[in-house]
Swiss-Prot record:
Source species: Pseudomonas fluorescens (strain SBW25)
E.C. no: 1.7.1.13
Purpose: Catalyzes the NADPH-dependent reduction of 7-cyano-7-deazaguanine (preQ0) to 7-aminomethyl-7-deazaguanine (preQ1).
One BP term from GO: tRNA modification
HAMAP family noted in UniProt: QueF_type2 (MF_00817)
Gene Ontology cellular component list: cytoplasm
Gene Ontology MF terms in the entry: preQ1 synthase activity
Pathway: tRNA modification; tRNA-queuosine biosynthesis
Record's protein name: NADPH-dependent 7-cyano-7-deazaguanine reductase
Length: 276
């Protein structure tokens, strides 16, 4: 467990506050998890962002009438901190009985508070339900590898030694799997996700990639670090000209987290999947 997470509200009984309380946000430094992967803020081999979607966003108009919407938050992958998810939920709940002059005022407040917690500017977008309905759900790009016939016996920790590639072939392709699962490092609750790998490099053996993804099944870590670990393991193996790894996790507590890591500039369409 990340030492800072021990002091967060995650896994503890919490009082739900319904009036605006920005102090509820609990930042967790990324540095310790980066260090586990041999990284530092100065040596990150990727660009990226963590997209959060909130489906339980509500506040009051000056008249006292409630509003509901969907919040979309984009936190830079190189920000000093992540925001602990339960504290994020509690903070958003604190808006429920708080009046804002208009949506722009709420967005400005969210931007200020979340940027302060993350340590870098956070992008905020508030979508109406009609806008979300119009966007619908998306299918992941590329080939789904989930129907490949594999044998698995170890689920306790990620196993990069399972990954194989053909050094004699260079390809450019997109593949994805819906079989990503890990566990929350604090509560041990399951985190269900789908993951996409897009790259140009030595041809990746798809069955070995699926075996590797399944090896995360009992692994305990935050969403962001799981994606960073996958990125680094594939980068070492494939020596790619370009590489993108991103995951879309099933929501918990009204929030879903979607980490995106890439050697390229961020080109990400934040549209939910069927399980989100």
């Amino acid at each position: 467990m990340h030492p800072a997470a021990e002091h967060s509200p995650l896994g503890k009984s919490s009082e739900y506050i319904s009036t605006y309380t920005p102090s509820l946000l609990f930042p967790i430094p990324r540095a310790a998890k980066w260090a586990e992967l041999g990284l530092s803020a100065e040596t990150l081999p990727y660009k990226g962002v963590d997209f959060w979607n909130c489906f339980e966003l509500s506040w009051l108009l000056p008249s006292g009438k409630p509003v509901v919407a969907i919040g979309e938050f984009s936190i830079p992958a190189d920000s000093p901190n992540i925001i602990e998810s339960k504290s994020f939920k509690l903070y958003l709940n604190s808006l429920n009985q708080t009046a804002f002059a208009d949506t722009a005022s709420l967005e400005a407040t969210l931007r200020t508070d979340l940027s302060a917690a993350a340590g870098k500017p956070v992008t905020v977008r508030i979508r109406t339900l009609a806008e979300s309905e119009a966007e619908g759900v998306m299918a992941l790009p590329g080939v789904c590898i989930d129907d490949l016939d594999i044998s698995v016996s170890n689920y306790e920790h990620p196993r990069p030694e399972l990954l194989r590639c053909d050094d004699a072939r260079v390809v450019e392709e997109s593949v994805h799997s819906h079989l990503l699962k890990s566990n929350c490092p604090v509560t041990s609750q399951p985190d269900w996700g789908s993951v996409v790998v897009e790259y140009r490099g030595h041809a990746l053996d798809h069955a070995s990639l699926l075996e590797y993804i399944v090896s995360f099944r009992q692994h305990s870590d935050f969403h962001e670090q799981c994606v960073e670990r996958i990125f680094l393991d594939l980068q070492r193996l494939l020596k790619p000209e370009k590489l993108t790894v991103y995951a879309r996790y099933v929501r918990r507590g009204g929030l879903d987290i979607n980490p995106y890591r890439s050697t390229e500039d961020v080109a990400f369409q934040n549209v939910r999947l069927a399980r989100q």
